[in-house]
A protein has these predicted regions:
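Ubiquitin-like/PB1-type beta-grasp interaction modules and other compact soluble beta-rich domains
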Residues: 1-89
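N-terminal, polar/charged subdomain of small-to-medium soluble alpha/beta proteins
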Residues: 4-6, 14, 71-77, 83-182, ...
Length: 242
């Protein structure tokens, strides 16, 4: 069987490519595929405990079986076909990956409606320092199709947990200068508490499960800012929500 393989972030640098196509024996699993590359790239093998895998844009375990024409992505820790129900549940919401500058004052008005009593806007911006050094700029990359799917999943879960009206979620890719906006989340609701709580849930969950990575550039070089890996159950239960 043939499998398409994708690498991101630091893993892409280790193997020297972003994409590959390999032929595997029937019955092969994710761990077999990773071992194949690990044998060729010993540095990659040493990162096994820190690598996540996705099969056809869904997080998968090492023992997950592979099938012909599967797309397998090996992912460093995140900085961070679509479900039909998610599409219908988020028909009023906006989730997008963009490359142009994000201007909060221009896009936040999209979530306002006459029935709303509150709009909360979270804006993540590029700061001028990290790791005790001056930051020159950042570069973001993403597993785009999967990132959009996970963003929509977050919107669906937000509606399950909180009484909110509209959601807008944007993340920018490419080179960002100091002070520019990397992510914007806007939430409207009849009441402020729900809008605040939903916004906090959205950014915290986004940082854990959406496959987007940033590379920090300094005067003496660049590093990938790896965050935490997604967990098996990314969303809190109803009892844990406020």
């Amino acid at each position: 069987m043939h499998v398409r393989v994708l690498f991101f972030g630091r893993l892409k640098e280790i193997v020297g490519m972003a994409e590959d196509t390999v032929e595997l024996s029937d019955g092969a699993r994710v761990e077999d595929l990773f071992a194949r590359y690990g044998a060729k790239f010993p540095e990659l093998a040493r990162f096994r405990s820190s690598v996540a895998a996705a099969v056809n844009q869904q997080y998968a375990g090492w023992s997950a079986p592979l099938n012909n024409n599967d797309e397998v992505a090996f992912l460093p820790p995140v900085s961070g076909g679509e479900n039909p129900s998610a599409e219908s549940a988020t028909a009023r919401d906006v989730c997008a990956i963009v490359r142009a500058p994000i201007h909060a004052s221009e896009v936040a008005n999209q979530v306002k409606a006459p029935a709303d009593g509150a709009v909360v806007v979270f804006e993540g911006i590029v700061r001028n320092h990290s790791r005790g050094k001056a930051t020159l700029y950042l570069v973001y990359e993403a597993y785009e199709n999967m990132a959009l799917a996970k963003m929509r999943e977050i919107c669906v879960e937000m509606r399950t947990l909180y009484q909110i009206d509209r959601i807008l979620m944007l993340h920018r890719l490419g080179r960002l200068e100091i002070g520019e906006t990397s992510i914007l989340i806007a939430v409207s609701s009849a009441h402020r508490a729900a809008a605040f709580d939903a916004s906090r849930f959205a950014i915290d969950t986004f940082k854990r499960i959406v496959p987007i990575w940033k590379q920090e550039y300094f005067r003496d070089g660049a590093v990938w800012a790896d965050g935490e890996f997604p967990v098996a159950q990314p969303f809190p239960s109803q009892s844990e929500s406020k």
